[in-house]
Each structure stands twice: as structure tokens, then as C-alpha cells.
A protein has these predicted regions:
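A conserved beta-strand/loop element that lines the FAD pocket in flavoprotein oxidoreductases
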Residues: 164-168
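Active-site catalytic microenvironments for nucleophilic, acid-base chemistry
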Residues: 6-10, 44, 163
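Glycine-rich FAD pyrophosphate-binding loop
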Residues: 6-30
Length: 168
């Protein structure tokens, strides 16, 4: 239904779209974890965020937590937002890597750089169970926030179906 909705959005009027699906194959209908690019797709279709969250029983997510990914008992949180803030001369990660090297060489205290995830607002907010929508101004730390959704995928499919059928 994503393809049908996208085609319905850009196709000339009176274009006939045929979608082939089998009623014999049931919908799994579990919660679906998305990534931030789905927001761009929904914007393209003109689907408002509040409508999506209401109709699909959705919530926000700030990243993906990979539990037991590397090995049992280990986890890795992949945030959607950006790390720190770049300067005109350097990317943030280059500055952090330099501080880390200085700490390893004993030039500064070993714990001075901290861990890189401490410099990612999405990671810190997720650990604390907090969320605030991003702000457009680059002057605020909230401008580094990126997010996605977790919602009922069956409901999202129904929403896209209605969208495509209304335009076809």
C-alpha cells in the first residue's frame, strides 16, 4: 500500500492503479518500528503526524536498542539524532576522537572525554524516558533531535489503503 499511495499521489488524474494482494495471506499486525525517513514519506503524502499517531496507535522512538546484538548481555543503542555540534573547522566526532586520544596519552584526565553516547541528545533522552519535538533553530540542542515512530503496522496499511483508494 505504500507504493500504491505514492503512485496515487503523483499520478495524473484518472490514472488507474491496480494493487494485487491475496486475502488468503493474513496481516501480521504487530507493532512496527520505523526509521526517521518514514516521516519524509508521510510528509510527501500529506499525512499529518498527529493523524498518523492517533490512527495507528503510535508513539515516538529515538533510536533502536540492539539487546544481545554483539553477544549475550551486551547491548547497543543506535540513536537517530546527531552527536554533539560541529564547528566550522571540525566535525564533532573528530573533536571527540582527539580528546579521547589525549586522554589515552595522559594529556588530560582519562575520564575527561566521557563516552560518545553522552553527547547524543536522543540517547540521553531515551535513557531518561524523555522526549521533546525538535526545534527548527540551529541555536538549540533540540535541533539535533531526530525521531521515528512505533505503531500498529496493520493500521498503517489500512490508512495508506484509504489514502490510495480516495485518490484513485
Amino acid at each position: 500500500w505504500m507504493c500504491a499511495a505514492a503512485i496515487a499521489r503523483i499520478a495524473p488524474p484518472h490514472t488507474h492503479i491496480t494493487l494485487v494482494e491475496s486475502e488468503d495471506i493474513g496481516v501480521i499486525g504487530v507493532g512496527e518500528a520505523t526509521i526517521p525517513t518514514l516521516m519524509e514519506f508521510n510528509d510527501f503524502l500529506g499525512i499529518k503526524e498527529h493523524d498518523l499517531l492517533r490512527e495507528c496507535q503510535g508513539t515516538y522512538k529515538l533510536g533502536i536498542d540492539f539487546v544481545d546484538w554483539y553477544q549475550k548481555g551486551q547491548s547497543y543503542f543506535h540513536p537517530f539524532g546527531f552527536y554533539g555540534r560541529d564547528t566550522p573547522e571540525f566535525s564533532f566526532h573528530q573533536l571527540w576522537l582527539r580528546l579521547n586520544a589525549m586522554a589515552k596519552n595522559g594529556e588530560i584526565p582519562a575520564d575527561a572525554p566521557g563516552i560518545i553516547s553522552d553527547y547524543n541528545l536522543c540517547t540521553v533522552a531515551a535513557k531518561q524516558g524523555r522526549f521533546a519535538p525538535p526545534q527548527g533553530s540551529a541555536d538549540t540542542i533540540l535541533s539535533t533531535m531526530r525521531y521515528a515512530y512505533h505503531f500498529d503496522s496493520a493500521r498503517y496499511g489500512q490508512m495508506l489503503r484509504r489514502y490510495a483508494e480516495q485518490r484513485n
